[in-house]
Amino acid sequence: MRLIALPAFDDNYIWALIAADGRAIIVDPGQAEPVLAAAQHQGLVPSAVLLTHHHGDHIGGVAELQQRWPDLELFGPADERIPADAHQVGHGERLRLLDVEFQVLQVPGHTRSHIAFVADGYLFSGDTLFSLGCGRMFEGTAPQMFDSLQRLASLPGETLVCCGHEYTLANAAFALHVDPTNAALQRRQQEAQAMRHAARPTLPISLKSELATNPFLRTGRPEIRAAVAPRAAGELSSEVDVFAELRRWKDEFRS
């Protein structure tokens, strides 16, 4: 299997995991056009679509893809805002698609029903875990999002994170504001700048690298707590408190 990132909108990625015969599993097709173009120019033939959550920039292309490939199978979370013909999958379930086993993880926070998929060494994290960041909490709570990130952080370090947006440079600016002496983070920013200058995706990225540089996965570190503490209205009695304040800070941050 090979993996390609299909850029969509301004900063989205649609992920395609492609078998040797061209059949492909598509993750979060917010637009149909990038998938249709890949089918035309690269011989890609979608056989299944995986949906992490209901937002339009992740599911907006589904109907057009179904028109082109009527036998396309859909899999997504149990949520009335997901296309009704999708197979509903939940935490711990396993799917076998194109001889690859996908594990479903429940990761609420960004939305109440958000899920992630793990397969073949890849983590398709949607808008839960980003490169050097995490998603906004539109429907979930800080404890939910913290637990979801911890669940993803427990995966093997060599797992490659395939998230839904190209946010690395924007997230690096905030991460360095919080953790300015982190040498690994400084290197990642420089590498990401070079990659974007060359019009290359900064993804996927190893979970090991994220654990060393992403402040939202480092809320137990004393330097992160120390950076957050002056902003907190009350005592930071747990990592969840640190995370919640860090997320509020990110929401307000302007580089």
UniProtKB/Swiss-Prot annotation:
Cytoplasm among keywords: no
Catalytic activity: an S-(2-hydroxyacyl)glutathione + H2O = a 2-hydroxy carboxylate + glutathione + H(+)
Entries under InterPro entries matching the protein: Clx_II_MBL, Glyoxalase_II_hydrolase, HAGH_C, Hydroxyacylglutathione_Hdrlase, Metallo-B-lactamas, RibonucZ/Hydroxyglut_hydro
Transmembrane segments: none
Cofactor: binding details: Binds 2 Zn(2+) ions per subunit.
EC main group: hydrolase
GO MF: hydroxyacylglutathione hydrolase activity; metal ion binding
Keyword Zinc: yes
Keywords: Hydrolase, Metal-binding, Zinc
GO BP annotations, alphabetical order: methylglyoxal catabolic process to D-lactate via S-lactoyl-glutathione
Swiss-Prot/TrEMBL cofactor(s): Zn(2+)
Pfam (any one): HAGH_C
Pathway the protein contributes to: Secondary metabolite metabolism; methylglyoxal degradation; (R)-lactate from methylglyoxal: step 2/2
Enzyme Commission code: 3.1.2.6
Positions with a binding annotation for Zn(2+) 2: 57-58, 127, 165
Entry superkingdom: Bacteria
Residue numbers binding Zn(2+) 1: 53, 55, 110, 127
Assigned protein family: Belongs to the metallo-beta-lactamase superfamily. Glyoxalase II family.
Oligomeric form and interacting partners: Monomer.
Stored HAMAP family: Glyoxalase_2
Function: Thiolesterase that catalyzes the hydrolysis of S-D-lactoyl-glutathione to form glutathione and D-lactic acid.
NCBIfam families associated with the record: GSH_gloB (TIGR03413)
Listed name of the protein: Hydroxyacylglutathione hydrolase
